[in-house]
A protein has these predicted regions:
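A short beta-strand motif characteristic of beta-propeller blades
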Residues: 2-4, 76-79, 120, 124, ...
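Beta-strand-rich domains and repeat architectures in extracellular enzymes and scaffolds
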Residues: 2-33, 85-91, 213-215
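Short glycine-/Asp-/Thr-/Trp-enriched loop segments that recur within the blades
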Residues: 4-8, 56-61, 82-83, 126-133, ...
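Residue-level detector of Asp-centered blade-edge/turn motifs that repeat once per structural unit
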Residues: 18-19, 93-94, 140-141, 221-222, ...
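Beta-strand C-termini and the immediately following turn/loop, strongest in propeller blades
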Residues: 24-29, 95-104, 110-111, 146-152, ...
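Predominantly five- to eight-bladed beta-propeller fold
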Residues: 41-78, 119-137, 147-205, 394-398
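Beta-propeller domains
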Residues: 153, 157, 165-300, 312
Length: 398
């Protein structure tokens, strides 16, 4: 079993200094730890007698100490569902107006003026059983507001007893919000409001019925549409939808269907070309791969990665040079298929480069500009090895 304290002479706690090609790390030895920095551009290495000395020499600001909060008044269960009712204001792009929820409805107000003055109520149909969510989004041009009507449901709880609390003799009954199979879930129905005229358009509820989630709302740069992702309960259907700001009509940009379930936790997306194209990750061919979409035509332009292997994650999309940096497993046939390697590939699906070719499970740290790559790799039967690579070619630098 690997133990970081019993394996010596490997780089640990490594990191790049901000906006530089200077690396700092520690080396464990039988005599203690060594503190080292390395300038990749100058091929210059320096050692220090302590962590504090190294941080001072390199201008590294020490991390603030974590201060845990104790006592029951600080407790909060992470499974509590946000009711989206808090009335905090959302500023318009030009900073002149702010929108917020008041009495279940959407209100706009001139920024900087008293809240009793210069406000305009944009909606009047919000109720306790179907109110406007506080997750308000202004369009980039400030003309529209996107918001959802939220239909809440009765909260369901799981109860458990803390039999021996540390600060009292009596047991404590806890409850945790927990929706069980078949329980009703909150529903969200999109609305777009013209701030000047007050005209509002609503999406067709039948296109987004039986929601598990409706999330990832985002305006397009031209303020013509709002994209969102609809996860139907049961996870057999997952769609990226686009809502027209003038008509409220929903159209499907991307659709994922599965007889078993769509692994929505693996999905990843990024708009490029000013929102005209979309990078999308999907398991639709039974392997997790990247696809390029034409957003307006709702069509796949190409599958970027393909094969009997799977993409693990995306580190960077270099739109200027048309490249994607990603991690993957299973590319090398004669290896354990779960070992992680790092690659780059063109958005055109060509010129895939293995940046970490050695057999092993790799962990990569790139410089801010992706000029260098610090690569640490190991296996269950091999101690960690750390090398410096050219992040464009994968060639060893040191």
């Amino acid at each position: 079993q690997f133990s970081a304290d019993s394996v010596f002479h490997w780089a640990r706690s490594s990191a790049w200094c901000d906006s530089t090609h200077v690396l700092h790390y520690q080396i464990s030895t039988p005599q203690g730890r060594k503190f080292v920095s390395y300038d990749a551009d100058k091929d210059e290495m320096k050692t220090y007698d302590s962590q504090k000395t190294m941080e001072k020499a390199l201008g590294i600001k020490p991390r603030p100490a974590y201060k845990p909060q104790f006592g029951r008044r600080h407790e909060r269960h992470w499974m509590e569902v946000d009711e989206e009712k808090e009335a905090y204001p959302v500023l318009s792009p030009d900073g002149k107006m702010e929108a917020y929820i008041e009495g279940y409805n959407v209100v706009v107000h001139e920024a900087g003026k008293p809240y009793t003055e210069a406000k305009r109520i944009l909606t009047q149909d919000g109720t306790i059983g179907c109110y406007y969510s506080n997750r308000i989004q202004w369009s980039p041009d400030g003309k529209y507001i996107f918001v959802c009507k939220r239909v809440p449901v009765e909260k369901r709880y799981a109860y458990y007893v803390e039999s021996s609390p540390a600060d009292q003799l009596q047991p404590i009954l806890h409850k945790q919000e927990y929706a069980k199979p078949g329980d009703a879930l909150p529903q969200h129905y999109p609305v777009i409001i013209d701030v000047t005229t007050g005209k509002k358009v609503e999406a067709d509820k039948h296109q987004i019925e039986n929601q598990y989630e409706l999330e990832w709302m985002q305006w397009t740069p031209d303020s013509k549409e709002v994209t969102m992702e609809y996860n139907q309960r049961g996870h057999h259907l997952y769609q990226m939808l686009a809502m027209n700001a003038e008509t409220g009509k929903l159209r499907t940009v991307v659709e994922e269907r599965a007889n078993t379930f769509v692994n929505y936790g693996r999905l990843w997306r990024q708009f490029i070309k000013d929102g005209k194209q979309l990078l999308w990750m999907s398991e639709r061919d039974n392997w997790n791969h990247l696809y390029l979409y034409d957003v307006q035509k709702s069509k796949v332009i190409r599958q970027i990665t393909k094969g009997d292997w799977f993409v693990r994650g995306i580190q960077r999309v270099d739109e200027e040079n048309g490249e994607i940096y990603f991690s993957a497993s299973g590319v090398n046939r004669n290896e354990d298929p779960y070992l992680v390697h790092y690659y780059k590939i063109g958005i055109d699906g060509k010129n895939m480069v293995a940046l970490t070719p050695e057999e092993g499970n790799h962990s990569a740290q790139y410089t801010y500009d992706y000029r260098y790559l610090l690569d640490t790799y190991s296996k269950v039967d091999a101690a960690p090895v750390t090398v410096l690579r050219d992040a464009q070619t994968g060639k060893l630098v040191k």
